[in-house]
Amino acid sequence: MLVQITALAFLAGIASAGVVVGGYGDGVGVGLGGLGGGLGGVGVGLGGVGVVGGGHGVVDLHTPAHYQFKYGVEDHRTGDRKQQAEVRVGDVVKGEYSLAEPDGTVRVVKYTADDHNGFNAVVSRVGHAVHPQVLVRKAVVPVATHGVVGVGGLGGLGGVGLGGVGLGGVGLGGGLGGVGLLGGRGGLDRGILGGHGGSELKFKRALI
């Protein structure tokens, strides 16, 4: 209260002296603001002391830790099934969790942990493993019959030539399974103009 009266008396003295210059007026305003801020700071400090003093009687740092939790997930769309539970009393933790494996079994893990023994876990499986059946597909190779110039092989490596039909096509100079136009060594077919072939002898006779 005394500070407020002093501040009012100070302002009245300045007003009667006729000091109206902007620079001086601003300086006085800043000074009074600083004085008010200082008083506010003292109030905040006292409040802080009260909070700290009240906190000493609430916190006990020697109380043993204690908690427990449990949760589970069961998703029928994705097949995800799992659960976990854990309890801690002081420095000893005990827990268990389980989850569904892809082979149809359930893995169960029971664990304990403390300062003396460390972490120990026992893992077990429940149920019988079901392995998915593997499908074996047999490859079917179509056999080419005949074409304009020659007969393609049963999957030869000849390039496409003058209108052959088949998987191998007609090779220009022979090949592994294609018909040779200029001879060469055909793997499965007869060369048209000579060379060695495997099976298509009647084709040359038909052309001659």
UniProtKB/Swiss-Prot annotation:
This protein's GO CC annotations: extracellular matrix; extracellular space
Tissue and organ distribution: Epidermal regions synthesizing hard cuticle.
UniProtKB keywords: Cuticle, Repeat, Signal
Q: GO molecular-function annotation terms?
A: structural constituent of cuticle
Q: Return the InterPro entries for the record.
A: CHIT_BIND_RR_consensus, Insect_cuticle, Insect_Cuticle_Struc_Prot
The secretion signal range is 1-17
**Chitin-binding type R&R domain ranges (all copies):** 64-135
Task: Outline the sequence repeats, range by range.
Answer: 34-43, 171-180
Q: For the region 2 X 10 AA repeats, what residue ranges are annotated?
A: 34-180
Where does the source fall among the domains of life?
Answer: Eukaryota
State its role.
Cuticular proteins play a significant role in determining the physical properties of cuticles.
Please state what the protein is called. Adult-specific cuticular protein ACP-20
Q: What organism does the record attribute this protein to?
A: Tenebrio molitor
